[in-house]
Every structure is written in C-alpha cells, then in structure tokens.
C-alpha cells in the first residue's frame, strides 16, 4: 500500500515557549467566492521541534506526520530563515 503525499507548509514561528514544540502561523491568500477579492487567511499549527532549534520570528518549513499529541500533527523539517534579533 502506497503512502499519501504529506503536506508541507512554510510559515513563521510565533511561539517557542513549550518544550520541543513550536507554534507556526501559515498565511495563505484566497479569492472571495462571490466578489473575487483576494483575502488573507492565517492558521496556526503546532509542530514538533526535537532539538528546540527554532526561535520566535524564524521562517520554517513543517511537514505533516502521525499524531504526536492532541494538537500536534506536524514536525519541523528545516529553518528557512532565522529571525534578526535587534
């Protein structure tokens, strides 16, 4: 039996306060069904970060995986861009 293609999202880390868990906001744009205007949507996902390497503000790529907890169904694949600390 062949495994399904897993979803991969890119987003920004908004929280890294939990141990081995990050919260990532993924923003998408869609057209309104009636008026056709482009609307921004955002959704938060909790992702597993084994080494606690991602920090708040980083741009990361996450991949769908088996359920790791009640809310956690994604894991960190890579850190695309690190946040600039001022």
Swiss-Prot record:
GO BP annotations, alphabetical order: translation
Domain of life of the native organism: Bacteria
Gene Ontology annotations for the cellular component aspect, listed alphabetically: cytosolic small ribosomal subunit
One Pfam family here: Ribosomal_S17
Keyword vocabulary terms for this entry: Ribonucleoprotein, Ribosomal protein, RNA-binding, rRNA-binding
InterPro entries (UniProt xref): NA-bd_OB-fold, Ribosomal_uS17, Ribosomal_uS17_bact/chlr, Ribosomal_uS17_CS
Gene3D superfamilies from the UniProt entry: Nucleic acid-binding proteins
Keyword Methyltransferase belongs to the record: no
Primary role: One of the primary rRNA binding proteins, it binds specifically to the 5'-end of 16S ribosomal RNA.
PANTHER family reported in the protein's UniProt record: 40S RIBOSOMAL PROTEIN S11 FAMILY MEMBER, SMALL RIBOSOMAL SUBUNIT PROTEIN US17M
Subunit: Part of the 30S ribosomal subunit.
Family named by the database record: Belongs to the universal ribosomal protein uS17 family.
The protein's name in its UniProt record: Small ribosomal subunit protein uS17
Source organism (scientific name): Lactococcus lactis subsp. cremoris (strain MG1363)
Gene label: rpsQ
């Amino acid at each position: 039996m062949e495994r399904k293609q897993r979803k991969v999202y890119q987003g920004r880390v908004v929280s890294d306060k939990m141990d081995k868990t990050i919260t990532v906001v993924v923003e998408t744009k869609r057209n309104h069904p009636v008026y056709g205007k482009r609307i921004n949507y955002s959704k938060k996902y909790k992702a597993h970060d084994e080494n606690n390497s991602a920090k708040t503000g980083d741009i990361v790529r996450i991949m769908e995986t088996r359920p790791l907890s009640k809310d956690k169904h994604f894991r960190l694949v890579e850190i695309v861009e690190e946040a600039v600390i001022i």
